[in-house]
């Protein structure tokens, strides 16, 4: 695997999957926060300590195969251009926080299912991404990588508290589980605000597509646990999965209600959005996301035939500003980005129909 391949293949293999409940759940993510006993926290460490952690991973983990993930590549943030960092964020392989660090790095698997972020808020953050509702499977993979790393380093661990992390909400298991979910039915029936309030009362967090502080573009929301202390990994996963399954049922009921009461209006909305995507010469990110959401809903409900439902996930990534500029070979102005976004969407839809 090379940096060029990572940059030029915008669609990660996990995005092409068709996991359980993938008509509503786009992806499942597990993240484990860990710190090393011998180093100060990332928020307090100096340049030399940050470099030592990079060198440790370069020595112990590069060009070593871990089945079934293949080999890993180390990407140092200070060796990447700002555009390359942005592409990694838009592909969900690193956090915006890591992209802004000078001595951060990412250990990335061939399949891009696994990324280990170094020198972010914690010394390492192990991330596993799976398509559909596969939290248990993602946790199993994360634990496998966690055990692999722990053979070479000693973690900061307290017998009574668990794993010690920079942020108090991560102390304990250090586990953050999240699900990316497409909820156009609940948005259209204006039930989403009530659902979010209920979710938050259960101790869960609702965010946009790129995590904290991001917007819920295209009716896509991230739902995750908040506290990790006092619960086992299995309990955290079970609680989140139970809530997600209830949200799935609420979304299905909302879709059925719209079809029963406003079928022709919904079909019109879907085909109008399809027409915009198939014919526009200029389209901004927000409009593209909303139209792609309508198109995906139309595919799921059977209004649109012959187009893969994965098109929402693929084009939501492909049409992000960083990836558009990466394909163009350099910076683009806003109007040029809108032009290239519209062109890419038209061509992608044309390929699907043929």
UniProtKB/Swiss-Prot annotation:
Gene3D superfamilies in alphabetical order: Glutamine synthetase/guanido kinase, catalytic domain (3.30.590.10)
Domain Phosphagen kinase C-terminal intervals: 24-254
Motif (RDXXRA motif of the pArg binding pocket involved in allosteric regulation): 337-342
Listed GO CC annotations: extracellular space
A Pfam family per the record: ATP-gua_Ptrans
GO biological process, one term: phosphocreatine biosynthetic process
Class of enzymatic activity (EC top level): transferase
Entry function: Catalyzes the specific phosphorylation of arginine residues in a large number of proteins. Is part of the bacterial stress response system. Protein arginine phosphorylation has a physiologically important role and is involved in the regulation of many critical cellular processes, such as protein homeostasis, motility, competence, and stringent and stress responses, by regulating gene expression and protein activity.
Entry's family note: Belongs to the ATP:guanido phosphotransferase family.
Entry binding sites for ATP: 27-31, 92, 125, 176-180, 207-212
A molecular-function term among this protein's GO annotations: ATP binding
Organism superkingdom: Bacteria
Record-given protein name: Protein-arginine kinase
Keyword annotations: Allosteric enzyme, ATP-binding, Kinase, Nucleotide-binding, Transferase
E.C. number: 2.7.14.1
Catalytic activity: L-arginyl-[protein] + ATP = N(omega)-phospho-L-arginyl-[protein] + ADP + H(+)
Organism encoding this protein: Bacillus thuringiensis subsp. konkukian (strain 97-27)
Notes on how activity is controlled: Appears to be allosterically activated by the binding of pArg-containing polypeptides to the pArg-binding pocket localized in the C-terminal domain of McsB.
InterPro entries assigned to the protein according to its UniProt record, in alphabetical order: Arg_Kinase (IPR023660), ATP-guanido_PTrfase (IPR000749), ATP-guanido_PTrfase_AS (IPR022415), ATP-guanido_PTrfase_cat (IPR022414), Gln_synth/guanido_kin_cat_dom (IPR014746)
């Amino acid at each position: 695997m090379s940096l060029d391949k990572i940059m030029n293949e915008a669609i990660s293999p996990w995005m092409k999957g068709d996991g359980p409940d993938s008509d509503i759940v786009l992806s499942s993510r597990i993240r484990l926060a860990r710190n090393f006993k011998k180093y100060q926290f990332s928020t307090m460490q100096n340049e030399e300590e940050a470099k030592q952690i990079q060198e440790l991973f370069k020595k112990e983990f590069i060009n070593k195969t871990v089945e079934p993930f293949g080999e890993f590549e180390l990407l140092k943030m200070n060796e990447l251009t700002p555009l390359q960092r942005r592409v990694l964020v838009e592909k969900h392989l690193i956090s915006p926080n890591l992209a802004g660090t000078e001595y951060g790095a990412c250990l990335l698997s061939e399949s891009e299912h696994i990324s280990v972020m170094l020198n972010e808020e914690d010394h390492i953050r192990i991330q596993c991404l799976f398509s559909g509702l596969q939290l248990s499977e993602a946790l199993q993979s994360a634990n496998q990588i966690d055990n692999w790393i722990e053979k070479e380093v000693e973690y900061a661990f307290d017998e009574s508290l668990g794993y010690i992390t920079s942020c108090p909400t991560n102390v304990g298991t250090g586990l953050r589980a999240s699900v990316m979910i497409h909820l156009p039915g609940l948005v259209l029936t204006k039930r989403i605000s009530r659902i979010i309030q209920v979710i938050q009362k259960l101790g869960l967090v609702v965010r946009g597509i790129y995590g904290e502080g991001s917007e819920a573009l295209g009716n896509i929301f991230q739902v995750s646990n908040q506290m990790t202390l006092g619960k086992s990994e299995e309990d955290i996963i079970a609680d989140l999965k139970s809530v997600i399954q209830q949200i799935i049922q609420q979304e299905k009921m909302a879709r059925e209600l719209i079809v029963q009461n406003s079928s022709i209006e919904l079909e019109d909305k879907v085909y109008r959005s399809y027409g915009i995507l198939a014919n526009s010469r200029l389209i901004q990110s927000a409009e593209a996301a909303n139209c792609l959401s309508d198109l995906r809903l139309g595919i799921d409900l059977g209004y649109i035939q012959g187009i893969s439902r994965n098109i929402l996930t693929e084009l939501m990534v492909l049409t992000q500003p960083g990836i558009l500029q990466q394909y163009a070979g350099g910076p683009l102005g806003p109007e040029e980005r809108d032009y290239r976004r519209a062109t890419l969407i038209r061509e992608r839809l044309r390929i699907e129909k043929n």
